[in-house]
Protein backbone atom coordinates (compact mmCIF):
# COMPACT_ATOMS: atom_id res chain seq x y z
CA UNK A 1 0.00 0.00 0.00
CA UNK A 2 2.73 2.59 0.82
CA UNK A 3 4.37 1.92 -2.58
CA UNK A 4 1.14 2.94 -4.30
CA UNK A 5 1.03 6.21 -2.40
CA UNK A 6 4.68 6.90 -3.23
CA UNK A 7 4.03 6.20 -6.91
CA UNK A 8 1.00 8.50 -6.89
CA UNK A 9 2.99 11.25 -5.18
CA UNK A 10 5.82 10.99 -7.72
CA UNK A 11 3.30 11.07 -10.58
CA UNK A 12 1.64 14.22 -9.22
CA UNK A 13 5.01 15.93 -8.76
CA UNK A 14 6.05 15.10 -12.33
CA UNK A 15 2.65 16.26 -13.58
CA UNK A 16 3.32 19.69 -12.08
CA UNK A 17 7.06 19.94 -12.74
CA UNK A 18 7.30 18.87 -16.40
CA UNK A 19 5.10 21.69 -17.85
CA UNK A 20 7.06 24.22 -15.77
CA UNK A 21 10.33 22.80 -17.09
CA UNK A 22 9.15 23.27 -20.69
CA UNK A 23 8.21 26.91 -19.99
CA UNK A 24 11.55 27.44 -18.25
CA UNK A 25 13.51 26.15 -21.23
CA UNK A 26 11.52 28.36 -23.61
CA UNK A 27 12.22 31.46 -21.51
CA UNK A 28 15.91 30.56 -21.30
CA UNK A 29 16.20 30.48 -25.11
CA UNK A 30 14.26 33.76 -25.47
CA UNK A 31 16.34 35.69 -22.91
CA UNK A 32 19.48 34.31 -24.52
CA UNK A 33 18.41 35.60 -27.93
CA UNK A 34 17.90 39.15 -26.61
CA UNK A 35 21.14 39.04 -24.53
CA UNK A 36 19.40 39.29 -21.14
CA UNK A 37 20.53 35.98 -19.71
CA UNK A 38 21.81 37.63 -16.50
CA UNK A 39 18.37 39.07 -15.79
CA UNK A 40 16.79 35.68 -16.38
CA UNK A 41 19.25 34.00 -14.00
CA UNK A 42 18.56 36.60 -11.30
CA UNK A 43 14.82 36.10 -11.75
CA UNK A 44 15.21 32.34 -11.64
CA UNK A 45 17.39 32.54 -8.52
CA UNK A 46 14.80 34.70 -6.75
CA UNK A 47 12.01 32.28 -7.70
CA UNK A 48 14.01 29.28 -6.48
CA UNK A 49 14.95 31.02 -3.23
CA UNK A 50 11.41 32.08 -2.36
CA UNK A 51 9.80 28.83 -3.50
CA UNK A 52 12.41 26.67 -1.79
CA UNK A 53 12.22 28.49 1.54
CA UNK A 54 8.42 28.40 1.56
CA UNK A 55 8.41 24.71 0.67
CA UNK A 56 10.85 23.79 3.44
CA UNK A 57 9.08 25.81 6.14
CA UNK A 58 5.58 24.74 5.06
CA UNK A 59 6.58 21.08 4.80
CA UNK A 60 8.23 21.13 8.21
CA UNK A 61 5.23 22.71 9.93
CA UNK A 62 2.59 20.61 8.14
CA UNK A 63 4.45 17.32 8.52
CA UNK A 64 5.07 17.97 12.22
CA UNK A 65 1.40 18.75 12.85
CA UNK A 66 0.08 15.81 10.83
CA UNK A 67 2.49 13.29 12.36
CA UNK A 68 1.80 14.57 15.86
CA UNK A 69 -1.94 14.14 15.37
CA UNK A 70 -1.59 10.74 13.70
CA UNK A 71 0.54 9.58 16.61
CA UNK A 72 -2.73 9.23 18.56
CA UNK A 73 -3.87 6.38 16.30
CA UNK A 74 -3.87 3.14 18.30
CA UNK A 75 -5.57 0.70 15.93
CA UNK A 76 -5.69 0.15 12.14
CA UNK A 77 -7.92 2.56 10.25
CA UNK A 78 -10.48 0.95 7.95
CA UNK A 79 -10.10 2.82 4.67
CA UNK A 80 -12.35 0.53 2.60
CA UNK A 81 -14.67 -2.13 4.10
CA UNK A 82 -14.46 -4.43 1.11
CA UNK A 83 -17.21 -6.80 0.05
CA UNK A 84 -17.59 -10.00 -1.89
CA UNK A 85 -14.19 -11.01 -3.26
CA UNK A 86 -12.68 -7.59 -2.48
CA UNK A 87 -10.57 -7.55 0.65
CA UNK A 88 -10.93 -4.66 3.12
CA UNK A 89 -8.20 -2.04 3.06
CA UNK A 90 -6.76 -0.92 6.38
CA UNK A 91 -3.91 1.44 7.23
CA UNK A 92 -1.58 1.01 10.19
CA UNK A 93 -0.29 4.00 12.14
CA UNK A 94 3.06 3.97 10.33
CA UNK A 95 1.28 3.94 6.98
CA UNK A 96 -0.97 6.80 8.07
CA UNK A 97 2.08 8.80 9.10
CA UNK A 98 3.67 8.17 5.71
CA UNK A 99 0.45 9.29 4.05
CA UNK A 100 0.37 12.40 6.23
CA UNK A 101 3.96 13.21 5.29
CA UNK A 102 3.14 12.78 1.61
CA UNK A 103 0.11 15.07 1.88
CA UNK A 104 2.27 17.64 3.70
CA UNK A 105 4.88 17.47 0.93
CA UNK A 106 2.26 17.90 -1.79
CA UNK A 107 0.61 20.86 -0.03
CA UNK A 108 4.01 22.46 0.62
CA UNK A 109 4.91 22.01 -3.04
CA UNK A 110 1.78 23.87 -4.12
CA UNK A 111 2.55 26.67 -1.67
CA UNK A 112 6.15 26.82 -2.86
CA UNK A 113 5.11 27.06 -6.51
CA UNK A 114 2.62 29.80 -5.64
CA UNK A 115 5.22 31.68 -3.61
CA UNK A 116 7.80 31.51 -6.40
CA UNK A 117 5.50 33.68 -8.53
CA UNK A 118 5.92 36.46 -5.95
CA UNK A 119 9.66 36.73 -6.56
CA UNK A 120 9.37 40.41 -7.48
CA UNK A 121 7.62 41.17 -4.19
CA UNK A 122 10.52 39.52 -2.38
CA UNK A 123 13.18 41.44 -4.35
CA UNK A 124 11.38 44.75 -3.83
CA UNK A 125 11.24 44.12 -0.09
CA UNK A 126 14.87 43.00 0.00
CA UNK A 127 16.05 46.14 -1.81
CA UNK A 128 13.54 48.59 -0.30
CA UNK A 129 14.56 52.25 -0.40
CA UNK A 130 12.90 55.08 1.55
CA UNK A 131 11.20 57.78 -0.51
CA UNK A 132 11.91 60.54 2.00
CA UNK A 133 8.21 61.47 2.14
CA UNK A 134 5.64 60.39 4.72
CA UNK A 135 1.89 59.97 4.45
CA UNK A 136 -0.17 62.58 6.36
CA UNK A 137 -2.38 60.04 8.18
CA UNK A 138 0.03 57.56 9.78
CA UNK A 139 3.40 59.23 9.25
CA UNK A 140 4.94 56.25 7.46
CA UNK A 141 7.46 56.63 4.66
CA UNK A 142 5.92 56.08 1.23
CA UNK A 143 8.41 53.28 0.64
CA UNK A 144 6.58 51.21 3.26
CA UNK A 145 3.48 51.09 1.06
CA UNK A 146 5.44 50.32 -2.11
CA UNK A 147 7.96 47.76 -0.86
CA UNK A 148 7.19 46.52 2.67
CA UNK A 149 3.40 46.25 2.88
CA UNK A 150 2.99 43.96 -0.18
CA UNK A 151 5.62 41.58 1.23
CA UNK A 152 4.03 41.53 4.69
CA UNK A 153 0.67 40.73 3.09
CA UNK A 154 2.28 37.95 1.07
CA UNK A 155 3.98 36.47 4.15
CA UNK A 156 0.82 36.63 6.23
CA UNK A 157 -1.31 34.91 3.59
CA UNK A 158 1.22 32.10 3.35
CA UNK A 159 1.32 31.68 7.14
CA UNK A 160 -2.46 31.74 7.24
CA UNK A 161 -2.62 29.03 4.55
CA UNK A 162 -0.18 26.84 6.48
CA UNK A 163 -2.11 27.34 9.73
CA UNK A 164 -5.47 26.54 8.11
CA UNK A 165 -4.07 23.42 6.42
CA UNK A 166 -2.52 22.36 9.73
CA UNK A 167 -5.86 22.77 11.47
CA UNK A 168 -7.80 20.86 8.80
CA UNK A 169 -5.28 18.02 8.54
CA UNK A 170 -4.81 17.68 12.30
CA UNK A 171 -8.56 17.70 12.89
CA UNK A 172 -9.02 14.94 10.30
CA UNK A 173 -6.23 12.93 11.93
CA UNK A 174 -7.80 13.21 15.37
CA UNK A 175 -11.16 12.13 13.94
CA UNK A 176 -9.46 9.08 12.42
CA UNK A 177 -7.85 8.24 15.76
CA UNK A 178 -11.14 8.67 17.63
CA UNK A 179 -9.65 11.38 19.85
CA UNK A 180 -12.08 13.91 18.39
CA UNK A 181 -15.75 13.00 18.00
CA UNK A 182 -19.19 14.55 18.04
CA UNK A 183 -21.55 13.20 20.69
CA UNK A 184 -25.27 14.01 20.05
CA UNK A 185 -25.85 14.50 23.76
CA UNK A 186 -22.61 16.12 24.96
CA UNK A 187 -21.49 17.88 21.78
CA UNK A 188 -17.80 17.84 20.75
CA UNK A 189 -15.73 15.30 22.69
CA UNK A 190 -12.03 16.15 22.53
CA UNK A 191 -9.13 14.28 24.10
CA UNK A 192 -6.59 16.21 26.14
CA UNK A 193 -3.80 15.87 23.58
CA UNK A 194 -6.03 16.92 20.70
CA UNK A 195 -7.40 19.83 22.73
CA UNK A 196 -3.94 21.20 23.47
CA UNK A 197 -2.75 20.76 19.90
CA UNK A 198 -5.79 22.19 18.13
CA UNK A 199 -6.13 24.97 20.71
CA UNK A 200 -2.58 26.12 20.01
CA UNK A 201 -3.15 26.03 16.24
CA UNK A 202 -6.35 28.08 16.60
CA UNK A 203 -4.49 30.55 18.84
CA UNK A 204 -1.93 31.01 16.05
CA UNK A 205 -4.78 31.53 13.57
CA UNK A 206 -6.21 34.31 15.73
CA UNK A 207 -2.77 35.94 15.95
CA UNK A 208 -2.53 35.90 12.15
CA UNK A 209 -6.02 37.42 11.91
CA UNK A 210 -4.89 40.13 14.33
CA UNK A 211 -1.85 40.77 12.17
CA UNK A 212 -4.13 41.01 9.13
CA UNK A 213 -6.31 43.62 10.86
CA UNK A 214 -3.15 45.55 11.76
CA UNK A 215 -1.99 45.54 8.12
CA UNK A 216 -5.45 46.44 6.84
CA UNK A 217 -5.20 49.85 8.53
CA UNK A 218 -2.32 51.23 6.41
CA UNK A 219 -3.62 49.35 3.36
CA UNK A 220 -6.60 51.72 3.35
CA UNK A 221 -4.30 54.36 1.87
CA UNK A 222 -3.58 52.14 -1.15
CA UNK A 223 -7.16 51.13 -1.99
CA UNK A 224 -9.71 53.10 -4.04
CA UNK A 225 -12.55 54.78 -2.14
CA UNK A 226 -15.23 55.79 -4.62
CA UNK A 227 -13.96 58.34 -7.11
CA UNK A 228 -10.76 58.97 -5.14
CA UNK A 229 -7.83 56.72 -4.29
CA UNK A 230 -6.91 56.43 -0.64
CA UNK A 231 -8.62 56.95 2.69
CA UNK A 232 -12.10 58.48 2.60
CA UNK A 233 -14.00 60.05 5.50
CA UNK A 234 -15.82 56.76 6.12
CA UNK A 235 -12.48 54.93 6.21
CA UNK A 236 -11.02 57.32 8.77
CA UNK A 237 -14.14 57.69 10.92
CA UNK A 238 -15.42 54.09 10.79
CA UNK A 239 -13.26 51.48 9.09
CA UNK A 240 -10.03 52.24 10.93
CA UNK A 241 -11.66 52.07 14.40
CA UNK A 242 -13.42 48.83 13.38
CA UNK A 243 -10.13 47.31 12.21
CA UNK A 244 -8.45 48.28 15.46
CA UNK A 245 -11.35 46.75 17.35
CA UNK A 246 -10.97 43.61 15.23
CA UNK A 247 -7.27 43.54 16.10
CA UNK A 248 -8.11 43.65 19.80
CA UNK A 249 -10.82 40.98 19.50
CA UNK A 250 -8.47 38.68 17.57
CA UNK A 251 -5.84 39.03 20.30
CA UNK A 252 -8.49 38.22 22.91
CA UNK A 253 -9.53 35.25 20.77
CA UNK A 254 -5.95 33.98 20.79
CA UNK A 255 -5.85 34.14 24.59
CA UNK A 256 -9.23 32.40 24.88
CA UNK A 257 -8.01 29.68 22.51
CA UNK A 258 -5.06 29.08 24.81
CA UNK A 259 -7.47 28.87 27.75
CA UNK A 260 -9.46 26.25 25.83
CA UNK A 261 -6.26 24.34 25.11
CA UNK A 262 -5.33 24.17 28.79
CA UNK A 263 -8.77 23.55 30.32
CA UNK A 264 -11.54 21.00 29.62
CA UNK A 265 -14.00 23.71 28.58
CA UNK A 266 -15.06 24.59 25.02
CA UNK A 267 -16.93 27.79 25.96
CA UNK A 268 -13.92 30.18 25.70
CA UNK A 269 -13.30 29.10 22.11
CA UNK A 270 -16.95 29.57 21.13
CA UNK A 271 -16.89 33.03 22.75
CA UNK A 272 -13.73 33.93 20.81
CA UNK A 273 -15.20 32.88 17.46
CA UNK A 274 -18.52 34.58 18.22
CA UNK A 275 -16.87 37.89 19.17
CA UNK A 276 -14.72 37.90 16.04
CA UNK A 277 -17.67 37.13 13.75
CA UNK A 278 -19.82 39.75 15.51
CA UNK A 279 -17.24 42.52 15.12
CA UNK A 280 -16.52 41.53 11.51
CA UNK A 281 -20.18 41.48 10.46
CA UNK A 282 -20.98 44.63 12.43
CA UNK A 283 -18.08 46.49 10.88
CA UNK A 284 -19.04 45.44 7.35
CA UNK A 285 -22.67 46.48 7.88
CA UNK A 286 -21.64 49.80 9.38
CA UNK A 287 -19.39 50.68 6.44
CA UNK A 288 -22.08 50.01 3.83
Predicted region positions:
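Contiguous transmembrane helix-bundle modules in multi-pass membrane proteins
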Residues: 1-29, 38-140, 149, 153-288
Amino acid sequence: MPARFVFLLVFLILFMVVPSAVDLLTEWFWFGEVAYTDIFIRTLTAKATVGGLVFLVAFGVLAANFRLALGRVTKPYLLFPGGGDIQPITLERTQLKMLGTGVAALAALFLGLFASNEWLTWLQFQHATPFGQTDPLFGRDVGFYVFTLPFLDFARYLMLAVAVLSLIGSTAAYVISGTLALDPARGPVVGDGARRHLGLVIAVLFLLLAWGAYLDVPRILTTPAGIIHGASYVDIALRIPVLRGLLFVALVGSVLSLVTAMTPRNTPLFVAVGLYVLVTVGGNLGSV
